[in-house]
Amino acid sequence: MDVFGVHHDLIAEYEAFTSSLVAVRDPDIESHLAGERERKTRWPDPKLALNPTFRSGGTVASLCDDGLLHPMCREYFRHKKHLNDPGSRTLSLHQHQREAIAVADRGDSYVLSTGTGSGKSLTYIVPIVDKVLRHPNPDGISAIVVYPMNALANSQLHELEKYLTWGVPEGHRKVTFARYTGQENSEQKLQVLKSKPDILLTNYVMLEYLLTRPDERRELIGAARGLRFLALDELHTYRGRQGADVALLVRRLRDACEAPGLQCIGTSATMATGVTFAEARKEIAKVATRLFGTKIEPKRVIGETLERSTDPGPDAVPGVHPANPLPTPSAAPPQRLMSFRPSTRP
């Protein structure tokens, strides 16, 4: 399919349609409309975006072989398609995911700041599952994951179902999980209160209720005594007054759970726009330290590591140099790119 040709034909048809509606006789108006067409005000050129190639960080199986992960993680984190599918192969990890797992193994708090689609959730789910398998909380809850929206919690619930229940061999220690938000009815909430899962998914509003409602505080917060992990997804959403509320909530949770060594994890696609990544890391670490109430070093802010997928030669793209990975604003695309037409063969 020639996407550029489709775009050109579509614009041409719409332009012919709109211009046929009214016959413009005034020369000034016609001149203005011609200028609008020349500047492509109504139909600008299409934007092209390239999917980044993240550097490989090995596989879950290799991390199990190295002793960085519990052997059972090899069975959990696999590519699965249906309920009874044990998975055809183990998950492959990106470099930033491996770095996060290594930092978590040392017991440090950290923040992951990488792009959309980079697998940020695995950077806390894998370490949490590993810790539950190695050192389960005898009181029940080992980790609380907080989302700013229920839609994100729902998506993560499905991922946990896929990894932790689909095709898992019988006889192995099960890692339990549950969602506790305003979506659950009374019966479902009662079941969570009784089961006390290893991993609890919630939002910051419901977490406030867990700390203030007597029954929920007694059952769930009591079961989270000595809490190991607190993960805040989409960290950049907690700003201003809401950020202050969540910061106080984190401190109250730490005290209520009697967890002075609580390991805090934050994930975000966008948090700082420094000139360099080193400057961005400092700013992100400062914000995360304020939010979590625990020291997060700039070196514990993990970013993505990309690999070049194009010809690195000096003439590959004008304006791109090894020391400057981004094209200069004045650099025009090469002519061979502008004249490129994908093959229409299947």
Describe these PLM feature segments:
Residues 1-99, 175:
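Helicase-associated low-complexity/disordered flanking segments
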Residues 102-110, 122-138, 251-252:
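Walker A/P-loop NTP-binding motif
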Residues 130-156, 169-173, 258-260:
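Conserved SF1/SF2 helicase motif Ia
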Residues 140-164, 205-209, 242, 269-275:
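Conserved Walker A/P-loop ATP-binding site and its immediately adjacent core
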Residues 152-181, 281-296:
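Conserved helix-turn-beta segment of the N-terminal RecA-like "Helicase ATP-binding" lobe
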Residues 183-200, 291, 325:
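Conserved motor-coupling elements within RecA-like helicase/translocase cores
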Residues 200, 204-209, 215-260:
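SF2 helicase catalytic motif II
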Residues 265, 269-346:
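Conserved interdomain linker/interface between the two RecA-like ATPase lobes of SF2 helicase motors
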